[in-house]
C-alpha cells in the first residue's frame, strides 16, 4: 500500500477550496488550515484476518482489507497511514500466534489502538467462546510481546463476551500548549484517530476561548477530550455524554488532570435540552443545580448528521458557539440558522483524514 505523498498538498488545497465555498454564504474570515503529517498519522486500525495454508501445509495468517470499489480482499503487511507502533505490532503479533491453535482458530479480526505515549491495545475478535485455556495462551502471548519491548494490552472479544487480561484501555499523554494532558482511551470506544491533529484542534479551541467569561456547556463530550483541555478557560464546565464507558473514562481523566471545575452528566444532548427547557425531570440531575451555571459558551461536536432541530434551537440561545464538525455539509446546513443570530469569528480545517474526502472543521461563532 503506497500513499500518494507527492499529491498531499494538492489534495489538502482542494479540501480547503471546497470548505471555503461551503462557508462563503456566511461571510467567514480566511480559513485556517491545519495540515497533517503525510504518513504514520493514524492511531487506530482494524483488519480482518485471513487464514490460508502454504505449500508445505502450514497455516498462515494475514491482515486483510477490502477494496472499496471492487470489494476484493487484499493482504496488508504494512499500513503506512498507521503509526509506527501499529506497524511493528502487526508483524510481531502474527509471528507470535502463528501455529497456535487456541489463539488462531476462528480469529476473524484484530483491532489496534495505539498512543503517542507508547502504549498499544490489541483486540482479538473470535467466532467462538473464549475459555480459560485461551486466556492462559493470551497471557503467555502478552508476556512474549512485553519481552520484545511492547507496552501492550490484550483483549479477547466474542459474542456477549470480553476478556481483558490486564485492562481494556491505554493511557494517552497529549502535549497541549505546554501542558501534558492524560487521557484514558478504552478499546472499542471513540477516540480521535489522528493524535497530532487532535492536539492542533485542542490548541485551536483553547485559543478561540482564551478570554472567555462565564461557564461552558459541552454536548457529546466523549472521554472529555475537549472539555478537559478547555476547562481552565472557564469558571465552570458542564458536559454531557451518553456512553457509560466514555463517562467513566472522562471521570478518570478529570481526576488525573487535576480538573476541579468540570461536571459530567450521563445523558443525551436531546435529554439535556428537555431538562434545560423544563420539559422533563431526570433523576441523573439530582444534586446538580443547573441554575448555578452561567453557560454563555457552548461547545458542540455532533455526529455526521449534525445538530437536530431542538438542539440547534437550544444552541442558538448561547452568546458564543464553538462547533467542531466531521461533516461540512451538515455544518453548512446548521449555519443557515445559526448565521441569522451569530457571525463566524474564526473558521478552521483540520486534516484528520489525509488522502480521503473526509473533512474535519471548526467554527467559532459570536452573537451579532
Curated annotation (Swiss-Prot):
Keyword annotations of the record: Methyltransferase, S-adenosyl-L-methionine, Transferase, tRNA processing
Catalyzed reaction equations: uridine(54) in tRNA + S-adenosyl-L-methionine = 5-methyluridine(54) in tRNA + S-adenosyl-L-homocysteine + H(+); uridine(341) in tmRNA + S-adenosyl-L-methionine = 5-methyluridine(341) in tmRNA + S-adenosyl-L-homocysteine + H(+)
Keyword Membrane: no
Entry-linked InterPro entries: MeTrfase_TrmA_AS (IPR030390), MeTrfase_TrmA_CS (IPR030391), SAM-dependent_MTases_sf (IPR029063), TrmA_MeTrfase (IPR011869), U5_MeTrfase_fam (IPR010280)
CDD domains for the chain: AdoMet_MTases (cd02440)
EC main group: transferase
Catalytic residues (UniProt): 326, 360
Binding site for S-adenosyl-L-methionine: 192, 220, 225, 241, 301
Keyword S-adenosyl-L-methionine among UniProt keywords: yes
GO CC annotations, alphabetized: cytosol
Its EC number(s): 2.1.1.-, 2.1.1.35
Pfam families: tRNA_U5-meth_tr
A single MF term (Gene Ontology): tRNA (uracil(54)-C5)-methyltransferase activity, S-adenosyl methionine-dependent
Family from the record: Belongs to the class I-like SAM-binding methyltransferase superfamily. RNA M5U methyltransferase family. TrmA subfamily.
NCBIfam families associated with the record: trmA_only
HAMAP family cross-referenced by the UniProt entry: RNA_methyltr_TrmA
Its job: Dual-specificity methyltransferase that catalyzes the formation of 5-methyluridine at position 54 (m5U54) in all tRNAs, and that of position 341 (m5U341) in tmRNA (transfer-mRNA).
Name of the protein this chain belongs to: tRNA/tmRNA (uracil-C(5))-methyltransferase
Protein source organism: Actinobacillus pleuropneumoniae serotype 5b (strain L20)
Gene that specifies this protein: trmA
Amino acid at each position: 500500500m503506497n500513499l500518494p505523498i507527492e499529491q498531499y498538498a494538492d489534495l489538502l488545497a482542494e479540501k480547503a477550496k471546497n470548505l471555503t465555498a461551503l462557508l462563503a454564504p456566511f461571510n467567514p474570515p480566511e480559513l485556517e488550515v491545519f495540515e497533517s503529517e503525510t504518513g504514520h498519522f493514524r492511531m487506530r486500525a482494524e483488519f480482518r484476518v485471513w487464514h490460508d495454508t502454504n505449500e508445505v501445509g502450514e497455516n498462515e495468517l494475514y491482515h486483510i482489507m477490502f477494496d472499496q470499489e471492487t470489494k476484493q480482499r487484499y493482504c496488508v503487511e504494512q499500513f503506512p497511514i498507521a503509526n509506527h507502533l501499529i506497524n511493528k505490532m502487526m508483524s510481531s503479533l502474527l509471528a507470535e500466534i502463528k501455529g497456535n491453535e487456541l489463539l488462531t482458530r476462528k480469529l476473524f479480526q484484530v483491532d489496534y489502538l495505539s498512543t503517542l505515549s507508547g502504549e498499544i491495545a490489541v483486540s482479538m475478535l473470535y467466532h467462538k467462546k473464549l475459555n480459560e485455556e485461551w486466556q492462559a495462551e493470551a497471557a503467555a502471548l502478552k508476556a512474549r510481546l512485553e519481552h520484545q519491548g511492547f507496552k501492550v494490552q490484550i483483549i479477547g472479544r466474542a459474542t456477549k463476551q470480553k476478556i481483558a487480561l490486564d485492562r481494556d484501555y491505554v493511557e494517552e499523554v497529549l502535549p497541549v500548549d505546554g501542558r501534558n494532558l492524560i487521557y484514558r482511551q478504552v478499546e472499542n470506544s471513540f477516540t480521535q484517530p489522528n493524535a497530532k491533529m487532535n492536539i492542533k484542534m485542542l490548541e485551536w479551541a483553547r485559543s478561540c476561548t482564551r478570554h472567555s467569561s462565564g461557564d461552558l456547556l459541552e454536548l457529546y463530550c466523549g472521554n472529555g477530550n475537549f472539555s478537559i483541555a478547555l476547562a481552565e478557560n472557564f469558571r465552570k464546565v458542564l458536559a454531557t455524554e451518553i456512553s457509560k464507558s466514555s463517562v467513566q473514562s472522562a471521570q478518570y481523566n478529570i481526576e488525573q488532570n487535576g480538573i476541579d471545575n468540570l461536571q459530567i452528566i450521563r445523558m443525551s444532548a436531546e435529554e439535556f435540552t428537555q431538562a434545560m427547557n423544563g420539559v422533563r425531570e431526570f433523576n441523573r440531575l439530582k444534586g446538580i443545580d443547573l441554575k448555578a451555571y452561567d453557560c454563555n459558551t457552548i461547545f458542540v461536536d455532533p455526529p455526521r448528521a449534525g445538530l437536530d432541530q431542538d438542539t440547534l434551537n437550544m444552541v442558538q440561545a448561547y452568546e458564543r458557539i464553538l462547533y467542531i464538525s466531521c461533516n461540512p455539509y451538515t455544518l453548512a446546513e446548521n449555519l443557515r440558522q445559526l448565521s441569522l443570530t451569530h457571525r463566524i469569528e474564526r473558521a478552521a480545517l483540520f486534516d484528520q483524514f489525509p488522502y480521503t474526502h473526509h473533512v474535519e472543521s471548526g467554527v467559532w461563532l459570536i452573537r451579532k
